[in-house]
Amino acid sequence: MSATTTALPSSPPGFMSRSAVLVAVAAMLLGLAMVAGPRYGALLAIGMGFGLALEGFRFGFTGPWRRMILNRDASGLLAQLICIAIVALFAFPMLANNGAEIKGAHAPIGLAMIGGAFVFGASMQIVMGCGSGTLVNAGSGNAVAALALPFFAIGSFGGAYHLTWWTSLGSLPVIALSGTSGLAITLAGLAAIGVLAILLGARNSWRIPARYWMAVAALAGLAILHLAVAGQPWGVVYGLGLWVAKGVVAMGADLSGSPFWAAPGNAERITASVLTDVTSLTDFGLIGGAALVAWWRAGLGSPIGKYPLRAWASVIIAGLLLGYSSRLAFGCNIGAFFSGIGTGSLHGWVWFVAAFAGSWFGIKLRPFLGLESRR
Amino acid sequence: MIRGHVVFLTLIGVAVFVGLDFANSAPLNPYNAPPLFSLGSGLAATGAHCAAPPPAQ
């Protein structure tokens, strides 16, 4: 069964309403900078920028992979690769020249990492949203994403809780490309995948639409700014797990049994304000930025999709799997694919292959789960 | 139910969570906050990231 997408007529917000909301958003960002510190206000603003760009230009990660697999439309995947290449052009020199101030999204390749990426790829196609996509879709009124989001967070908490056990199953040391030669290898790898996508894609599907180019410019610029401000690349799923960790600790749970959550850095973040956590702030910004675009467009009057019960149950399970698997995989499309490859981590490449294979299965599963008509 | 209701519930959920966390977490101190840019600060990046390897057991 497919979603009902008939839009109800609704008038766009007027000049006064738009001005009032923009002033309120600016006041909120300035207020956070004053109360918590300028870096945190800036990170919330950068997160909102990500949300504005992804929703405003209707760009993402899950949809382009789906169109590549189903329709052999390579344009979205090519845009992603170009965006990562631009980030890498700036990130590699920043990492090489700034020591401990800047760190990459570097993670080890392992059995659980590969399996996690595969499951994440399948789950993101079921929900039709990756890490950033689920936040953006929830912020713009997509009921599937809004239902998946809390379970994504619970799964992320659980995956992190068990992460040490999973990595003990077999894991290589962290391998990261660096310097000019590392950048050259990264750009050559991205180009090779791009050529492969063009060869496998339908005729003329290599033509990238203008809105994708604008999204690429915005996302690359914001990602480089994020790296300079936070000292680390853009990520999503750590923050989601942290929210649940904070919740269970507030309810009296003891997390000392988890090597991950009991580690000093993570235990400190549980007690610190969420308004000082890098990924939480950009996650909030993604939701807020997408909501702002959806409201601005007057696109909030559409009824939500109608699905059978088994579809909603599938979304809950897929949400849990998204969170759990993304921690095993050391990131989602953003933390592993986008930021991992963009900062030279070999795990980002392995993540891409495994998640793309998983996506194929996820797309095949959707009709059987009641999320779309059988072809 | 329309998309606007979903957005409203999502934003309310975030606001309630942030409010509860604000009330229960360590107080914010802007005078002890890191500089705006990590780049050029001379300070090590200390934020958490999903790609960070787990702590050794």
Feature annotation, model-predicted:
Chain A
Residues 2-375:
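Membrane-interfacial helix-loop segments of redox and metal-homeostasis proteins
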